[in-house]
């Protein structure tokens, strides 16, 4: 059974995107009721699932931010703690509030500039942002890709909630 799932996953990875989307869309619509770009969400999960029912567990956070433990901000490899994550989120919030173009590329470029200015590693900044906007440790995409799909207002609201959670 494990090998069959793996083979199916390989088949899905090689599948033409339009065909994949046509087959995945009903599974995505079961979870996502908001007006989000479902094609972008499908592209995120295409290489990460083995069977279509797996989609729900990968994308549920787009519909609603789950409750999560502030310990999720702690990541040994990224060298992030609750304290450093709080500082990063407080630093990037006004930057993102001022950001007009909320496309993945523009967000990544702006956050990369912040990373260069502060002299920290990319993961040190992106880990807390991704945690705040998704409420998960594992996501089908990075922080800026997720924010592009969520949009500016929802992304900022989730970052504010992350700050509140870390300040408790």
Language-model segments: what does each one mean?
Residues 17-118:
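Small-residue-rich helix-loop
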Residues 13-17, 53-56, 135-142:
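Short helix-capping/linker segments at secondary-structure and domain boundaries
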Residues 1-33, 145-168:
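Non-catalytic terminal extensions that flank enzyme cores
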Residues 1-10, 50, 120, 131-136:
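Core structural elements
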Residues 104-167:
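Charged substrate- and nucleic-acid-binding regions of tRNA-handling and nucleotidyl-transfer enzymes
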Residues 1-5, 18, 39, 43, ...:
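Non-catalytic, well-ordered alpha-helical scaffold segments
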